[in-house]
């Protein structure tokens, strides 16, 4: 039976995302566990167009976009020491972390 922990990181700022991945990778490597990644996932770009003027000038518009960067880390065959090390990692406020436990048969 082979277990895996998949960690998905998501952020609007790529600098804070890279810093968070470095902290997680160093914490896992200190426990001598096998880690794959960081694997960069496709970025999601959301674009919004709004009118500058509420009435007359319909051709005058502003365009905004939000870029969401994503990374994936996979820890093969984790032990309780790895889970304890992951719980002690302090990450930046702008980074969203999703942790999935996958058990193989």
Curated annotation (Swiss-Prot):
Keyword Ribonucleoprotein: yes
Superkingdom of source: Bacteria
GO cellular component: ribonucleoprotein complex; ribosome
Single GO term (MF): structural constituent of ribosome
Keyword 4Fe-4S: no
Keywords: Ribonucleoprotein, Ribosomal protein
Pfam families, sorted: Ribosomal_S10 (PF00338)
InterPro entries: Ribosomal_uS10, Ribosomal_uS10_dom, Ribosomal_uS10_dom_sf
One BP term from GO: translation
Role, per record: Involved in the binding of tRNA to the ribosomes.
Family the entry assigns: Belongs to the universal ribosomal protein uS10 family.
PANTHER family assigned to the protein according to its UniProt record, in alphabetical order: 30S RIBOSOMAL PROTEIN S10 FAMILY MEMBER
Quaternary structure note: Part of the 30S ribosomal subunit.
Protein name: Small ribosomal subunit protein uS10
Species in which this protein is naturally found: Rickettsia bellii (strain OSU 85-389)
Gene this chain is encoded by: rpsJ
């Amino acid at each position: 039976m082979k277990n895996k922990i998949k960690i998905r990181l998501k952020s609007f700022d790529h600098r804070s995302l890279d810093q968070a991945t470095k902290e997680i990778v160093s914490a896992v490597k200190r426990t001598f566990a096998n880690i794959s990644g960081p694997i960069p996932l496709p970025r999601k770009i959301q674009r919004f167009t709004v009118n500058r003027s509420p009435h007359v000038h319909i051709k005058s518009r502003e365009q905004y976009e939000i870029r969401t960067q994503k990374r994936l880390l996979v820890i093969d065959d984790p032990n309780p020491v790895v889970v304890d090390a992951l719980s002690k990692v302090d990450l930046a406020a702008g980074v969203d972390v999703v942790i999935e436990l996958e058990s193989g048969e």
